[in-house]
Amino acid sequence: MLWRDVCEIFNKIEKTTKRLEKRDYFIKLIDMVKEKGKPEDLKKICYMAIGRVYPEYDERELGIGEKLLINAVTSIGIKKDELLEKIKETGDIGLAIEQLKSKIKQASLFFQPLTVDEVYETLKRVGEIEGEGSQKKKLRLISSLFLRASPIECRYLARLILEDMRIGMNVPTILDALSVYFNVPKEKLEKIYAITNDIGLLAEKLLMGDLESEELKLKLFRPIKPMLAQLTPSIEEALLEMGRAQFETKYDGARVQIHKDGNKVKIYSRRLEDVTNALPEIVEAVKNINVDKLIVEGECVAIDKQTGKPRPFQDILRRFRRKYDIGKMMKEINLRVYLFDILYKDGVSFIDEEFEKRRKVLEEIVGYENDWRTERKRIEKELKSDKIIDISYKLVTNDAKEAREFYNWSLSIGHEGVMIKNLKAPYTPGSRVRTMYKFKPTLESLDVVITKAKRGMGKRKDWYGSFEICVRDEEGNLYPIGHVGTGLTEADLEFLKEEIDKIIIRDLGEEVEVEPKIVIEVAYEEIQKSDKYPCGYALRFPRVVRFRFDKGVNEINTIEDVERIYEIQRGRK
């Protein structure tokens, strides 16, 4: 399968803004692979389309910055000063290289055309090179690809190396294309993808006609996308919908997914990042659980042992992000994990089991229920304990008054509110479901991503003063919903200056456009209808609550979330 043929389709995908047209072009790619290539080619093309070489769950990166890429390109005859000027003009290194490559003698005519396999395997080798002289070796490999590439191939090769394809292709659109082409319900593919986090593997198995492959099943040490809750306007409304339900304390912590096989333990964040090394005390506590193979979910909370109440969320992030002096940090910040679900135990998957059964299995493993109705005194006594592994506090009821008492108690011990869970519901990975709700005392804050930064004035003249913030639609397209500048300390502004300067796409004078990589949580006075923004809404008086380093752009709030909160807000007026 020729890389050139794939790039021609990528170009068509890039030119259209219509999701269905993007899907249909990708269907043509699938058809091309079926005719000219092999299933493994489709696997690689799926990764490439979303700017990856490795599967989504795999944390490895190529680690090639723009500087090394520029050096690789200048070694094949493109002048550095011309390239830098063209990058400034286009705002896109891929387009810049394409335009300049078209002006030099086409040496690529004397070489065999690049194949998908060659491009993919070469970049994999680049990502695996380490040690002394690694930069020179990487430079040679990358240069060899650009030497043989045509101008359009150079555009997508450069973007792939920087892991940003800019064609507007995402996993949901690929899943849609696979569903249409192979005539398989999209919901089925979405579930498999959420379990594997490997769109390439899924596509390959579909082309092989092997959708029941063991490789597509739940697997230890391959984290799965978490099931997410929706917001409910009231406890009464949730009970009206569910009937008898399980209420659990909603913790202000960081969600973790824990995998255990004997003495091997891995801990993953909600973004599926491996945070094992930062949490050694949790690893040791999990090793002592008397189960051989296990996948459980929980909330990791920083605990103040003097009061038994949770410490600020930022303390948890300090632990998660720590790479050095971990022992010292362990003494400063004590952690506790409240387990709340089980997905796998000793060769048996529990994903399709009802929540009531999953909870019972989890309680058998821990050895107690933490039932607020019958064990409240013991629970309160143990708030200040050294316990590292616990199980979420629960109340099973259909009585709104009793549920409200449990909710108020959860707030009184320093937590956020309650989760409300349908006892009969299976675990639906990767979905925001209507079988699990969260209820908090105030309007839900929003997780948004920064897309522009405006240069500051006065006291903020050395930093950026305000930031354009965006939510997303279901396809991953970003929509501005306001600008925020309050709630930030000088240290925050200094941090943002450093981070934003690394991800500038285009300098627009008074402001800069940046890659959507910095996620922040914002509070606001209210959500308003607005013609100013294409999404139709604007935040009134937004303020930064905290940085969400545990979340990526795919996990920010959606326009649908904004609409739902807006309706809840109207109901409260």
Curated annotation (Swiss-Prot):
The active site is at K250. Its EC number is 6.5.1.1. Pfam families: DNA_ligase_A_C (PF04679), DNA_ligase_A_M (PF01068), DNA_ligase_A_N (PF04675). Gene3D superfamilies: DNA ligase, ATP-dependent, N-terminal domain, DNA ligase/mRNA capping enzyme, Nucleic acid-binding proteins. One of its GO terms (biological process) is DNA recombination. It catalyses: ATP + (deoxyribonucleotide)n-3'-hydroxyl + 5'-phospho-(deoxyribonucleotide)m = (deoxyribonucleotide)n+m + AMP + diphosphate. Its cofactor is Mg(2+). GO terms for molecular function: ATP binding; DNA binding; DNA ligase (ATP) activity; metal ion binding. ATP binds at E248, R255, R270, E299, F340, R432, K438. Keywords: ATP-binding, Cell cycle, Cell division, DNA damage, DNA recombination, DNA repair, DNA replication, Ligase, Magnesium, Metal-binding, Nucleotide-binding. DNA ligase that seals nicks in double-stranded DNA during DNA replication, DNA recombination and DNA repair. Belongs to the ATP-dependent DNA ligase family. This is DNA ligase. It comes from Methanocaldococcus jannaschii (strain ATCC 43067 / DSM 2661 / JAL-1 / JCM 10045 / NBRC 100440) (Methanococcus jannaschii).
